[in-house]
Amino acid sequence: MTSKRPGGSSFQPEVKRKRESDEFEQCYVSRFENELPSVPTIDKTGWARPAVDKDLGISKSIACQILEVETYHEDGSATSYDRTNVKLYGVTKSGNSICVIVTDYFPHFYFQAPQGFGVEHIGTAQSAICNMVAAAKRRGGSGQAQLPGKVVDNLVHVEIVHGENLYYFRGADTKVPFVKVSGSTEALHKARMELKNGVNLMGKGPVNVGNLYESNINVIVMFLAKTNIVGCGWIEIPAGKCRILSNSEKSSRCQIEVTVPVKNLIVHESDGEWAGIAPIRTLSLDIECIGRRGVFPEAIKDPIIQIANLVKIEGEAEPFVRNCFVLGTCAPVVGSNIIQCVNEKVLLEKWAEFVREVDPDIITGYNILNFDLPYILDRAKVLSLPQVSHLGRQKEKGSVVRDAAISSKQMGSRVNKSIDIHGRIIFDVLQVVLRDYKLRSYTLNSVSYQFLSEQKEDVEHNIIPDLQRGDEQTRRRLAQYCLKDAYLPLRLLDKLMSIINYIEMARVTGVPMNFLLTKGQQIKILSMMLRRCKQNNFFLPVIEANSGDGEGYEGATVIDPIRGFYNEPIATLDFASLYPSIMIAHNLCYTTLLKSPQGVENEDYIRTPSGQYFATKSKRRGLLPEILEDILAARKRAKNDMKNEKDEFKRMVYNGRQLALKISANSVYGFTGATVGKLPCLEISQSVTAFGRKMIDMTKLEVERIYKKGALDGKCPADAKVIYGDTDSVMVKFGVETVAQAMEIGLDAAKEVSKIFTPPIKLEFEKVYSPYLLINKKRYAGLYFTKPDVHDKMDCKGLETVRRDNCPLVAKVLGVCLEKLLIERDQQSALDFAKRTISDLLCNKIDISLLIISKELTKSGDKYQAKQAHVELAARMKKRDAGSAPRLGDRVPYVFVAAAKNVPAYERAEDPTFVLQNNIPLDTKHYLTNQLAKPLARIFEPILGDRAEKILVEGEHTRVRTVVQSKVGGLAAFTTKSATCLGCKSVLPRAESENAVCKHCEPKLPTIFASRMNTMHELENHFGRLWTECQNCAKTMQDKVNCSARDCPIYYMREKVRNELSEASAVIERFGDPCFQAPTK
């Protein structure tokens, strides 16, 4: 009789398991409530910041480092007008958090005063613009329809200033009157819109004000430029010059909150005493959530089960807080505080309380911007926990998540999340690594291995529910995993000096650190330009952005290479800071650009090789050359300070500064050439590259003219020959035999050739290559010498050893071959190794991890013009298992598998794990033809000639190939596999299909069995070693290995050996009970 009860069907066990799973995932709190009858008291010792000195601001001045800058709009009322306040968040020297509110700053813009406009017209102009703004506010429904006349008259402020347009030289002293309009950001926005239609400035009817100036400049950038405050710089407020707010008056959670007028701020240069860094607090976090089977966790349904946190003070070696908020019971973790929570609501509330208590300046982690933080905030919404979103320093403002599309040449196009955590900087390590480094893979495991030589256990989200459902020991393991994921980002920040480098970049360019993390490259140069313009009374015009399809310009010169393998030393002459030096030497700037020649050529103006005209230094010193001179001088000082400094942390700070200065100097040229930018000026960028091309050609001619055979008192054994030149360097063969001789002549050549150029343009000699393999333009390799005794490194440019668009096998093989060619100088050994690798590839002896190619999934398949291998594979993987399939922004690893002839490449791409599990044969011919052959041929052509590729891909080493039998696809689904004899491989009759061997091989059965057992023991030993290696990596000596790190070669080895072991075990089972009769004599 069939039961009517729910779940009483024949599928009852499956339904029961599903129901239990759903109940656990959706409402599994009761079990943990039983385990936690009372929530333990949280140990907050050491969380809070130091106590505030009561004399600060009263009898002692307040000095603080500014980390974050915000503006907020304050609406006017019946007795006051709109204003824009600026909040500066920072840290004092003693480690107290502070919020400085500047209440008397007004943003502004300019327009050129109309003919006849004078001081007597200011009142009329102000009244006209104020009335326009008031009318616009009424139309906008701002709720201020009946503003009193006094308030309306003060919506904006108008005054006359004198200056000139940044673009073009018009004479030595051509300052003209401009109208400056100041007010709140909202008032200025409405004024800017209304001015397009004309305004009655002089009481004689509407006047078209023409082009506006600086109306498109970010308010924060404008404020910092006006006050000379720089991002991450130090300011000081003298004692008694500010108003200290009481706790009831504070709008922020900072320990100190003051209001101060702009005039009372003392701004310090980032040198000497003020070059240091305050005790900045960095919080690194990682979350774990429990998803449903086959579905990646979704915040609307899937709860957070753990949040790991580490807090570190910049400059200290180790974190001073290590804790993990855990849902349920959890065994202790050495060195960490485990905070057990009865349910997810308690977990989130207590974690948010922890963040507010520890009060970090920087929040970091790996992919926290696009996953961890949005997930936490979304869960808080689902659970109706508004206080959890209050993670910032503003009391009444919660954190908000938005989508932010960014597009740049450096990072490509992508959509990130933008999160406002007021007063704190979100420093996502993933975003920093994406911006600053070109890697094959950007998983935390891969990046950690790249920079720290350390790996971590990578647990798939499908395994996390099992660990959470287990006991306190399995949850302890999950906590260890979570803590490691929070710890590694801190290690990476220290190793890469990312925070120090970004602090110094903020100081050099003047913009807040947050701008460097979230905005493009141009904001840095724009900030420096704006500051210099303020000092010299230049105004930046608003340039309408175009589509970027304007005409380009000719780039740098590349002297055609004389290709070959050079056993003799090749000297390299480099121009020091070429493009900045050209701009300084020839006074190239917006302010010196001429529409037509004026005066005497080379005295009053110069004509550049590209046909543009610029005023000489005698007429006007350009702003860009002044900026660049200051940057290069500051870099020289920073390098000297670094050289003389004994303290390691201060040395790191100086190194970060000199790197920031170097990057900034090299960015100025690109800023002028950006057609889609704030201040494009192709005349400058065209002239710079034209001068560069001319100088490379001049260098070639001069070197070959001076260093003839017998020159330099007979030290030149042959005529010098420039074999290659590229952008800012030339490679010269002087015909000498030793590196020391090449260095001596190279130093002399740099000194002599520099004489023909205008200072500060200077040739420098730094290195010699010996030997040198010149393959083509921008493709070469050689041993790099800066001292004559021993080489510094093997330097490769443009070769597959440093490129990411090939599989790792290519880089590995080319690297070994180059070592044999350049270091061992054994050409035959290099060729033999290449042939041996090709043979191993065709015989399926190459580990699959070396054949994986990965590409980023930046958009869905229908948005690509042609089908892409990684996009099509991602779609197939989604159909198999949507939960583990790659998502937008992920890098998709794939290999090429064998298929029928003429099947396109995008259909032959497959997931490496799927290939291993199903024993799918790889397309080794594709790897040889499309990946390995041409790169190898390129490095062997200078040695073997045009036949290099034929020698490599044909011959005895390519005749033996291994064919793998696939378990899926092709004919595998339509064929039945017949049992074969394990001895002679003959097909067994159907009646004997369960036997291990045929009748002819039965006498050899013990020998065959022993051989197969040996094979299985070898595989077991191999698997055991791999398993132990993974346990050591995960620090779990006795637990099961759950790691599935796709970037780790051990993972693929382990999976391959696991499959081989399974097949070997099946073979052993065919022998039945191992009781064999000894053969009769």
Swiss-Prot record:
Domain of life from the UniProt record: Eukaryota
EC annotation from Swiss-Prot or TrEMBL: 2.7.7.7
Additional detail: In eukaryotes there are five DNA polymerases: alpha, beta, gamma, delta, and epsilon which are responsible for different reactions of DNA synthesis.
Organism phylogeny: Eukaryota, Metazoa, Ecdysozoa, Nematoda, Chromadorea
Gene Ontology BP terms: base-excision repair, gap-filling; DNA replication proofreading; DNA-templated DNA replication; nucleotide-excision repair, DNA gap filling
Zinc finger (CysA-type): 981-1001
GO MF entries: 3'-5'-DNA exonuclease activity; 4 iron, 4 sulfur cluster binding; DNA binding; DNA-directed DNA polymerase activity; nucleotide binding; zinc ion binding
Family to which the UniProt record says this protein belongs: Belongs to the DNA polymerase type-B family.
Organism the protein comes from: Caenorhabditis elegans
The keyword DNA-binding belongs to this UniProt entry's keyword annotation: yes
Annotated keywords: 4Fe-4S, DNA replication, DNA-binding, DNA-directed DNA polymerase, Exonuclease, Hydrolase, Iron, Iron-sulfur, Metal-binding, Nuclease, Nucleotidyltransferase, Nucleus, Transferase, Zinc, Zinc-finger
PANTHER family given in the database record: DNA POLYMERASE CATALYTIC SUBUNIT (PTHR10322), DNA POLYMERASE DELTA CATALYTIC SUBUNIT (PTHR10322:SF23)
UniProt note: domains: The CysB motif binds 1 4Fe-4S cluster and is required for the formation of polymerase complexes.
Protein name: DNA polymerase delta catalytic subunit
Membrane-crossing segments per the record: none
Cofactor detail note: Binds 1 [4Fe-4S] cluster.
Gene Ontology CC entries for this record: delta DNA polymerase complex
Function: Possesses two enzymatic activities: DNA synthesis (polymerase) and an exonucleolytic activity that degrades single stranded DNA in the 3'- to 5'-direction. Required with its accessory proteins (proliferating cell nuclear antigen (PCNA) and replication factor C (RFC) or activator 1) for leading strand synthesis. Also involved in completing Okazaki fragments initiated by the DNA polymerase alpha/primase complex.
Region ranges (Disordered): 1-22
SUBUNIT field: Heterodimer with subunits of 125 kDa and 50 kDa. The 125 kDa subunit contains the polymerase active site and most likely the active site for the 3'-5' exonuclease activity.
DNA-binding among keywords: yes
Top EC class for this record: transferase
InterPro entries assigned to the protein according to its UniProt record, in alphabetical order: DNA-dir_DNA_pol_B, DNA-dir_DNA_pol_B_CS, DNA-dir_DNA_pol_B_exonuc, DNA-dir_DNA_pol_B_multi_dom, DNA/RNA_pol_sf, DNA_pol_B_thumb, DNA_pol_palm_dom_sf, DNA_pol_type-B
Motif annotated as CysB motif, chain positions: 1030-1048
Pfam family, one: DNA_pol_B
Residue numbers binding [4Fe-4S] cluster: C1030, C1033, C1043, C1048
Cofactor(s) needed: [4Fe-4S] cluster
Subcellular locations according to the entry: Nucleus
